[in-house]
Structure formats: C-alpha cells, structure tokens
A protein has these predicted regions:
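Acidic, low-complexity Ser/Thr/Gly/Pro-rich repeat segments typical of extracellular/periplasmic
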Residues: 1-38
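Low-complexity, Ser/Thr/Pro/Gly-enriched N-terminal "stalk/linker" regions
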Residues: 36-81, 125-128, 132, 233
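Active-site-adjacent structural elements in enzyme catalytic domains
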Residues: 55, 78, 105-120, 143-145, ...
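Well-ordered alpha-helical scaffold segments within catalytic/enzyme domains
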Residues: 36-45, 88-102, 117, 157-172, ...
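Sec/Tat-exported extracytoplasmic proteins
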Residues: 18, 63-67, 93, 122, ...
Length: 247
C-alpha cells in the first residue's frame, strides 16, 4: 500500500563537483509504503497485556538498586535513584504480586526495603524528598542548579505508590502491619503547608536548605501536578486549605 508519493526533479542547470552542467534533467518518482507482514508471532490481547506488564515490572525489579531497592533513573545511572520512578515501581510490584509474577512475600520485602531506606538513611526536607538520591548512601543528588532539596511533585509520585502499597498489604501479619505503620509515619510527616511559601494560595515545587524557594516554580496544571494537590488536600496531619486546592 502506497502511503505517499513524491516527485524529485533534478534541473539540468545543476553543476557537478567538477563544475560541468548536467546534460539532461531527471525526474524521479519516490513512493513510501508500509510492509504489513507480521514481524512477530501474533498473540491474543490478554497475552500482550500480560507481556507489557511483565516487562514494565522487570525494569523496576531487575534494575532496582541492590542496596536501597529504589528505582534507578536509568539503566546506566549507577547509584542515582529517583523518587517518582520508585513510586511507579512500587505500583508495578503490586501488580506483579497480584498477577503471580512474584510472591506476595517478595513484594512486601522489597517495598519494606525501600521504606526503611527512606526512613533511616535519606534526608527529608519538611517530610519531602529530593528528586534524585544516592541509592547507596541516601545522600541528596542535586537535580539541577539550586535544586538540592525537596521536590514536592516527585515526592507525590513516590507516595501515590507507597499509599497504594499500604492499601494492598492489608493482611494482619507482623510484616504487613509493620509496613503499613512505617508508610503511615512517613506520609504523615510531609508538611505540605510549608510549600505554600509564606502562605500563598499555591504550592511550590522545590525547597532547598541552601537556596530556599529561589527556584520559584509554582505547581500548576492538569498533569503530574494534580496528584500533589490531591495528596496535600488529603493529608491527615498537614493538609492544605480548601482555597489552595481550588486555586
């Protein structure tokens, strides 16, 4: 099937590299097409969905940092792990446990490793975490100039995963009860109101212990920003006012 047709016209006045003129012009017809033959074995939609879920999960599981369990920024990022990506990874682990890719015990152990690392070895800034963290030490890895402290949106992406895990691991066992308690403690420690910057009716993306709110980036938009306002409004300890959510 032809998708597009093009006509290439070479004018006889065109000179060669030696300076001579072409004796005759040329017209070439170029057509683009699509090779619609199968390149891989066809599989049912449900099998395709399972394969996509498995491969997505494998990134977070196989390439998770060996010490902290958190998600690496990319496969070549060494010790640099990402908070928001870790939230995505936690949710992938819940799917993996539910689908039987791993056991429930394996999933709860990995999530507990992540939570313990965040709790015991990472620096929290008014309860929020940096975008990048050294997965071996817990030290903040600056994401950009003057961005060496809290990233509230990345923290939100992290906690949407952790809160999903808290809801999923609901069995009355010592292991799952401990995980729920640890997640709750970290969740309740986030001071969302601090990020209003002098009480403004908007949340700010960054805060640095060295530069304060100098990056001055307000969190706005129907995108990854929305989860921040949902979590900030639903906090049991440091909820933002209704006017901030509605603004």
């Amino acid at each position: 099937k032809v998708l597009s047709s093009y006509k290439l016209i070479v004018n006889p006045g065109v000179k060669s590299t030696s300076g001579t003129l072409l004796s005759n012009g040329k017209v070439c017809m170029i057509k683009t097409g699509m090779d619609d033959t199968d390149k891989f074995e066809r599989i049912p939609d449900e099998d395709l969905l399972t394969l996509v879920q498995k491969q997505t999960f494998k990134y977070f599981w196989d390439f998770g940092h060996e010490y902290s369990g958190m998600a690496r920024e990319r496969t070549t990022s060494g010790d640099v792990v990402t908070t928001g990506g870790t939230g995505f990874g936690v949710m992938a682990m819940l799917v993996a446990a539910e689908r039987g890719f791993i056991t429930r015990q394996q999933a709860v152990e990995r999530v507990q490793k992540i939570v313990t690392f965040l709790d015991k070895e990472c620096t929290a800034y008014h309860g929020a975490y940096a975008h990048w963290i050294n997965g071996a030490t817990g030290a903040t890895k600056p994401f950009s100039e003057k961005d060496n402290g809290a990233d509230l949106v990345e923290t939100s992406l992290l906690f949407q995963g952790l809160l999903a895990a808290r809801a999923y691991f609901k069995e009355n066992t010592e292991v799952e009860s401990r995980l729920r308690a640890d997640i709750t403690r970290l969740w309740e420690a986030i001071d969302w109101t601090w990020f209003r910057k002098n009480g403004e009716d908007v949340l700010y993306w960054h805060w640095s212990p060295d530069y304060g709110f100098e990056k001055n980036l307000a969190i706005r938009g129907w995108n990854e920003c929305l989860i921040t306002y949902i979590l900030a409004a639903s906090s049991p300890t440091h909820a933002i006012d209704k006017v901030v959510y509605e603004a």
